Amino acid sequence: MKIKEIIVVEGRDDTARIKLAVDADTIETNGSAIDDHVIDQIRLAQKTRGVIILTDPDFPGEKIRKTISEAVPGCKHAFLPKHLAKPKNKRGIGVEHASVESIRACLENVHEEMEAQPSDISAEDLIHAGLIGGPAAKCRRERLGDLLKIGYTNGKQLQKRLQMFQIKKSDFMSALDTVMREEQNE
C-alpha cells in the first residue's frame, strides 16, 4: 500500500513500524517539544504532498497532534485505538507496538481536518447518551472514538472533534447504538 502523504510520527521506532506496514515517508517529531524546524518541515510537506498525523493514543500523542494541527491547518488524521497500540507483555503504549494490519486499517480511515461547522449533534445529545458525566462515560467515549475512527477525547473535546471531522448525526447514532448494545451484552 503506497501512501502519497507524508506521515508524521513521534519517533524512529514508529517510522520503522510504519515502513513495515506501508510504503510511505515519515517526519519524526522526536517528542512533544516540537522544534520550529520540524514544524517548518511539516508545513512544507503539507503544501507539497499532504500530511497524515499518526501519533500514539496517549496524552503526549494528543498534545503533539494538537500542536501540529494548530501550526499546520488542513492535516489529515489517522487514529490508532489504544487496545491496538499496547505491547503483548510490556508496559507502554504506542504506534511501534501496533500490528501491520492495525496500521494499515487506521491509514485507510483517515479524517481530514476541516473548519468546524455547526453540528446537529448537540451537547445535550452527548449528555443524554451518557458520554459526558456518569460512571461509564469514559469507556463509552473511547469505544465511540474507535468506531467512528476519530480517537479518544475527553468530554469537553468530544463535540469539537465530531464537528471538526464533520461526523454526521446518523453515523454518530449508529456508532452509539453499537456501543450501547455491546454494553448490554457484557
Curated annotation (Swiss-Prot):
Changing G11A: 30-fold loss of activity. The gene is rnmV. The keyword Cell inner membrane does not apply. Belongs to the ribonuclease M5 family. This is Ribonuclease M5. Requires ribosomal protein L18 (rplR) for catalysis; it can be replaced by 30% dimethylsulfoxide suggesting L18 functions as an rRNA folding chaperone. InterPro entries: RNase_M5, RNase_M5_C, TOPRIM_dom, TOPRIM_RNase_M5-like. GO terms for molecular function: metal ion binding; ribonuclease M5 activity; rRNA binding.
